[in-house]
Amino acid sequence: MESKIYKMELAGRELSFEIGKYALLANGAVLARYGDTAVLVTACASEKPREGINFFPLTVDYEERLYSVGKIPGGFIKREGKPSEKAILSARLIDRPIRPLFPKDFYHDVSVIATVLSVDPDNPPDVLAMLGSSVALSISDIPFEGPTGSVLVGYVDDKIVINPTAKEREVSKLHLVVSGTKDRVMMIEAGAKEVSEDIMLEAIMRAQEEIKKIVEFIEGIVREVGKPKMEYQKRIVPEDIKQKVREIAYDKVYQYVQIPDKIERDKKLDELKEEVFKAFEGETEETLLLVDDALYSLEKEIVRKMIAEEGKRPDGRKFDEIRPLYAEIGILPRTHGSALFKRGYTQVLTVATLGTKGEMQFLDGLEEEEAKRYMHHYNFPPFSTGESKPVRGPGRREIGHGALAERALEPVIPSEDEFPYTIRLVSEVLTSNGSTSQASVCGSTLALMDAGVPIKAPVAGISIGLITKDDGSFILLTDIQGIEDFFGDMDFKVAGTREGITAIQLDIKIHGLTKEIIEKALYQAREARLKILDFMQTVIDKPRSELSPYAPKIFKTTVDPEKIRDIIGPGGKMINKIIAETNVKIDIEPDGRIFVAAPDDISGNRAISMIEGIGREIEVGQFFLGKVTRTASYGAFVEIYPGKEGLVHISQLDERRLKSVDEVVKVGDLVLVKVIGIDKLGRLSLSRKEALNVTYSRKAK
């Protein structure tokens, strides 16, 4: 094929797709450019279907190349390793809008690989990779019912902005990625600073307008260079198998799916599956796969028909009803904050840990190096679904759900000036029956409040499901459980405060959503969210006023940046002396802010006093927390900061007359003293007696 470049304008910048020049053996390949960002996207499919499976084997990889931003990988091995968390999240962004657009009976392995070649900060490569994947699949011979378009949406100065620049993204109240076909929305991923439902809907529909232009542009490319779609062997269940499965299972499935209790319901359905397979004993593996397909289709048909035509949900709830809620806080005594949140069978334990500034996570990827002081991790162990299998590291799903919960709470996390701690949340899914990510949002809010983190507002999350009918009408289901998620058309996760939305994640199994569905889902989610927030505030209505006694105590001071060198000392001598004497951790910022993490108030105040004393002009009347270094018959010598001592005469040690210095102090004691005199040689006269009634507390709030 002859190389050709197709161009269009998008948000005032040129978007181009170059086809026929790169990756010539791939089924479809395109070099996508937007500004100075360039991503090569390829799509390949196996020649034959994979044997013995009943799922679509699609894999999507997002390959970050550090040369794209002029960097050499750090560490001993100077090449890229396993995908970063950002790369995994980007791969999920590409996957989710395209997966529903492949034929349901297509079992060939399909691989989509997006390789980032050049990055312009104003034009994020992940959204460009989404566009490239749509083009690569659409022009290939792989069966794909696209194309799709994707855009990033911001909300800056009360205006919706399509594909905002890096500066605009910094001040935007919204980070929204929307993907869709010409007339329907396929995927939504959003983080927001308490944005209203009206603004969110407007932003989504504004995105859809741009997506329509992109899709029409790609359709034009496909008409010119698109390959004919490959013929593939369709796996069709014969009517006799369908009929036999129906005769055995219909009445029992209808009865069992209405059992409210998940454990009992799953047990009965598993027994029924064994009964059905027993009726086909001796058949080939291929036939048994068809039997499995027939049983799945029957269960799906019955559950959807029961909801759509009879108005019944499997557990008997109304369409807008939330499962029973339960929550408990402070259940792990040695952690800094903990909460158990339950919604029906779904059960999540979240633990909050407070750390020092030095425990922040440093990210060095395609973007500028970034320090993360708040993070959320989500674990989904096999026992949560009652399965017996090895425990592996976090998969893409865990990373995606953790990022969603992290994004949901980020707008309410206090600033570093308000709360100078690093915050880590870990959500352990103990029992899964749908909507575990949103349960982790609720549990995280409670754990933060239990830990005494002054969050700006509580956050709750809910999942809305969808059942569409043949006539185009639809039913929305609040708080979907596992069986409704499995057989339904949508999982629309919405998290937020009473004021607005903080995060959205939409996954669908059909060919897109209309404006009407999205609008109703947003408002139904809001109604449920407010009910959950009401419940959560009966458990704890505001953050605890005090931190856990096991949390580090953070003290903060600010010094002249020019004094930092003196505080560190030659070869770190001075700062190491402070650390050794007070048993603290010290983090120094270039702007002069100094954070001290201490095991107790005395150590923290002592360290702050020592730091502030270095290079400071001492004046009569100032107070210091010092350490007794030696004693004599006439008084005690007190070091008020490293290298600076003063004498507390025996007459200044106490209000009463003393016979011996040892009656009040001994070497190693910390004492609060006041400077009462400085002689011509700079020697200090100190008084403990005048400082006795002074409360010394410099603990950072």
From Swiss-Prot:
Its cofactor is Mg(2+). It is an enzyme of class 2 (transferase). GO terms for cellular component: cytosol. CDD domains: KH-I_PNPase, RNase_PH_PNPase_1, RNase_PH_PNPase_2, S1_PNPase. InterPro entries: ExoRNase_PH_dom1, ExoRNase_PH_dom2, ExoRNase_PH_dom2_sf, KH_dom, KH_dom_type_1, KH_dom_type_1_sf, NA-bd_OB-fold, PNPase. It catalyses: RNA(n+1) + phosphate = RNA(n) + a ribonucleoside 5'-diphosphate. Pfam families: KH_1, PNPase, RNase_PH, RNase_PH_C, S1. Mg(2+) binds at residues 485, 491. This is Polyribonucleotide nucleotidyltransferase.
